[in-house]
Amino acid sequence: MSTNKSFSSETSERYSRALFEVANETNELDKIENDVRNFQSLFNSSSEIKNFIQNPTQSKNTQNNVINLLSENLGFSKNLKNFFLLLIEKRRIFFVKKISESFLRLCS
């Protein structure tokens, strides 16, 4: 990787490649790509969701509950839901916008 890349860019690319590999290996690439587009649309259109996800003071438990609810209501793939839960566990959920953008670039 280029040394000029920021930590957030490198981290986002690493996570997006991991999601891409899981989606590809489980033959869910189209489904997860569509789910990520739906999530990205929600994230970009809802300041409440954006602020909630980017707020570092939110507890992991609260973030997990919100992701579980969103996943259920929007019909996200189990793999995408688990990926979001991993991001929360690793305290990387605030990278979700960059990860989503990077993932969608990989899909195109």
Model-assigned labels for residue ranges:
Residues M1-S108:
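Elongated, mostly alpha-helical coiled-coil "stalk/stator" tethers of large membrane protein machines
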